[in-house]
């Protein structure tokens, strides 16, 4: 029975994956979303038959539309294989057998026969993983912070230790998307349906960044109030927020 199911699964999956895909940005994203998977648009106004393709396979000839303000990261079996920072439409091409499609001129043998046999070896499913992710190149606003208790620093003007509670917001911008993904983003966010959002309280990586921002406030206040060029006055902070941030 398992053998028959594997045959049906491999053939059915191969046929479903022959269609070219059309990938775009998912709807309903928050402004602070930094990284998320491109989603295939199976139907448009009720028209379209490409609704049963494999979730981890991108067929050759598929089109990926990159909007303004975003970059495109391509993955093959967990490895970054490409990056595009310019907006526009891009065509997916891969030498992987699972991406072969008769609609992109890959031939009948590779697209159907060989691909079905390879999938049969994996119980009917493709033995490969491909993905396209969008990374925001815009400024990511409204990242809020605050302290639950007072933080202390040595004040040069008052010549004593001063404490204060703080709250505010800061803006982030990803300047190296590849380094951001390789060194910061947890693997759980490199999956379809996941959104890496810096304001998500359940995002451990974003929470760590928040903790580092709060942890840097005390030494920053100390440096500011003990800098003779600033007049040693914490009261000047509101007029010099950019100078304090530096």
Map each language-model feature to its residues.
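N-terminal hydrophobic membrane-entry segments
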Residues: 1-246
């Amino acid at each position: 029975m398992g053998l028959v199911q594997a045959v049906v699964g491999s053939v059915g999956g191969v046929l479903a994956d022959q269609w070219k895909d059309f990938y775009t940005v998912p709807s309903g994203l928050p402004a602070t979303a930094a990284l998320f998977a491109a989603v295939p648009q199976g139907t448009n106004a009720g028209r379209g038959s490409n609704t049963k393709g494999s979730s981890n396979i991108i067929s050759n000839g598929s089109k990926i539309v990159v909007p303004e303000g975003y970059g495109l990261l391509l993955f093959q079996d967990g490895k970054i294989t490409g990056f595009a920072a310019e907006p526009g439409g891009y065509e997916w091409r891969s030498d992987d057998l699972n991406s072969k499609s008769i609609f992109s001129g890959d031939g009948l043998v590779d697209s159907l026969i060989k691909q079905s046999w390879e999938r049969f070896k994996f119980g009917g499913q493709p033995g490969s993983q491909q993905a396209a992710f969008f990374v925001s190149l815009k400024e990511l606003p409204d990242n809020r912070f605050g302290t639950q208790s007072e933080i202390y620093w040595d004040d040069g003007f008052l010549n004593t230790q001063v404490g204060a509670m703080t709250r505010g917001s800061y803006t982030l911008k990803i300047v190296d998307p590849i380094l951001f993904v390789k060194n910061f983003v947890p693997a759980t966010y490199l999956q379809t349906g996941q959104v890496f959002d810096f304001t998500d309280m359940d995002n451990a990586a974003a929470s760590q960044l928040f903790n580092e921002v709060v942890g840097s406030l005390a030494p920053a206040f100390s440096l500011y109030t003990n800098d003779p060029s600033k007049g040693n006055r914490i009261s000047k902070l509101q007029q010099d927020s950019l100078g304090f941030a530096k």
